[in-house]
Amino acid sequence: MDSTYALHLAVATLLGASFAAASAYYMHRKTLDQLLRFARSLDRDHRRRNRHLLDADDDDDDDPPRDHDRRTTLPIPPGLPPLHTGREGKPIISPASTKRVGPLVRPTTPRSPVPTVSAFETIEDSDDDDENIAPDAKNNAVSLLTNGTIGSDPLPGKASQNGDTKPVPSTNMIRSQSATGSLHGAQHNPVAADILRKEPEHETFSRINITAVETPSPDEIEAYKVLQKCLELREKYMFREEVAPWEKEIITDPSTPKPNPNPFYYEQQTKTEHHFEMVDGVIHVYPNKDAKERIYPVADATTFFTDMHYILRVLAAGDIRTVCYKRLNLLEQKFNLHLMVNADRELLAQKAAPHRDFYNVRKVDTHVHHSACMNQKHLLRFIKSKLRKEPDEVVIFRDGTYLTLKEVFESLDLTGYDLNVDLLDVHADKSTFHRFDKFNLKYNPCGQSRLREIFLKQDNLIQGRFLAELTKEVFSDLEASKYQMAEYRISIYGRKKSEWDQMASWIVNNELYSENVVWLIQIPRIYNVYREMGTINSFQNLLDNIFLPLFEVTVDPASHPQLHVFLQQVVGLDLVDDESKPERRPTKHMPTPEQWTNVFNPAYAYYVYYCYANLYTLNKLRESKGMTTIKLRPHCGEAGDIDHLAAAFLTSHNIAHGVNLKKSPVLQYLYYLAQIGLAMSPLSNNSLFIDYHRNPFPTFFLRGLNVSLSTDDPLQIHLTKEPLVEEYSIAASLWKLSSCDLCEIARNSVYQSGFSHRLKSHWIGRNYYKRGHDGNDIHQTNVPHIRIEFRHTIWKEEMELIHLRNVDIPEEIDR
């Protein structure tokens, strides 16, 4: 009985299992058929849309249903990637291969930490894509309503040669996805050849639109008006060229400019009748000797300090600080959201730009001191080379005796074999943090000032020959890299008027010229040192020694021919020294430079005003004679009081450092609105005033401030042969900057630099002076239009907000 019951139970179980298996097979077969029909319908819709975009004639007839077995006989739609073949030349066809069209924006979790994407990350689709996409919504623009809207809008159409606007066909970033039978739905990146077929300048992207309150509160309106006045004050002081460089010289062929065959050629120019004289620390220029009214007036010191105090009162106003703090946070979050929805598109656009990547886009070292422009290993090799090849060269006069190079090292009890990088001791270490005095001592190789005088000075017994040879080697390294440029700071101290001629003679006689290099003049703010030494008697003497030779050579180039040639390569004036030194805030009624005879150093703002006022007048005079102009680009905001940044806001085109902007949301927001260039040096700051992880550079970048990376002092800071790339690489690694971020920073550095209009046209595009995506050429900058359009749109919205929608945004950048 038991055996019969067991047999019946086994038969029943077998029949039940068979029925279940048959049912499962049937349901599986039916599901596959439905999926295949849905895939074929998507495929037909996709081909139909492609035909509408690519063909001139529209075909409105629906495709008839096709059997699954006949799908391989369909004509190949235009624009599809080439057929991949196997080893024997047979096409590889996956029976389950389909192309699924997803929405433009998917609410997926980003694969890299917000706000950035790793520079080395590949693009992958999320594994948790929505499998149930409605057919009528598969290509619709996405609208995410979360305190605003996000819409997918194409970039404006291309303009034809006749000025007509041509519509640009939408090339949505559809990534090919193959169902290869993997149970986990593994997806593959697009084939490189397919990516390169895309036109990167035609990509669509998701725009961020946050609808603000229609009517701001009275407090906000008042704050906006105050900020608007601050911007107007800056515009009142700024020197702008009457004719923009792109209007003087129209570039039709942005090919590689021919190098200057004779950069030191002196062309005779006629002396003009201009007359100038120093009045209360500012040079007044008259059309002739008999004229009574000056022709290039500039705001006086009382007006400047009054306006600066107004800026300082604005910085301290609580309601304005609140408004600016909120706007800055909103700018940062907008960029984070932009990366969440557009980072993949930006990277694909970069991949679609042939030849360009971070390594071969132009990048300018916008802040580097000439005396420290080489790395420590380079300096060590050079010293050993000279000690081996020229030991008997007389190089210095000390204690009434002329010494050869060999005798100098014997007096130090050193040989060439003894020298190493550690003994050279020029690299900054922990002992230099908050010790600017110790940092300056690092300019002395082996701790010996005589070695600095021999190798790192141009006004020495050998007339700076060693430094000139070392400089040429650095120039050679830059030219070999091709894509790296530098703006070297070289010092004029103001102790005597002949310094300018000595400097120009050293440059011209040693033929120090490179297409990759321009010069800035740095003025150390050490009046108190010269006054205590008795070299000068008043601050007026310092100004006379610095500016009178410049006006003389401008009026009559024949009076200083070498200086005239040298000034053609000078693009900026810098103020340098330790900003952390305590100082008294200047008042509205300060003593004139002639009255400043005490031994105390004037405040930073005092230096800035008198350098600005004389430089403004000089530029007006030089522009009237068709000569190059010089911009004020001081060190500012590395340490010290916020007054420094307020004074620079009114007077300076760009500044170096600016880390103290993090202490003032109002001033930071004003620097953003004015797009004042910040040449920041995080590694240098890390050795002196602020740890790397606390540096505000990444925050400034997210918020849209005009920031670039620079090296400052490669001799003391960096370890490699390419210090600028080292600066970028460390920033990219620690702050997770993407390739797009790095290229945007490099593009900013070219804008901030003082290189010529012709070179900038070749480096970043011939329309670089236009705002927005019209001024961007991804084939030159490797920065996608998506990023440039986002930055411009957000900045434009902020400007319209500050001006209460009553502002005319210029189509070109500031001159």
From Swiss-Prot:
Which GO molecular function annotations are given, in alphabetical order? Answer: AMP deaminase activity; metal ion binding
Give the cofactor note: Binds 1 zinc ion per subunit.
Low complexity: which segments have biased composition? 105-116
Pathway the protein takes part in: Purine metabolism; IMP biosynthesis via salvage pathway; IMP from AMP: step 1/1
Its Gene Ontology cellular component terms are: cytosol; membrane
The record, for CDD domains, names: AMPD
Recorded topology in the membrane: Single-pass membrane protein
Q: Which domain of life is it from?
A: Eukaryota
NCBIfam families registered for this protein in UniProt: AMP_deaminase
Record note on quaternary structure: Homodimer.
Q: What is the protein name stated in its UniProt record?
A: Probable AMP deaminase
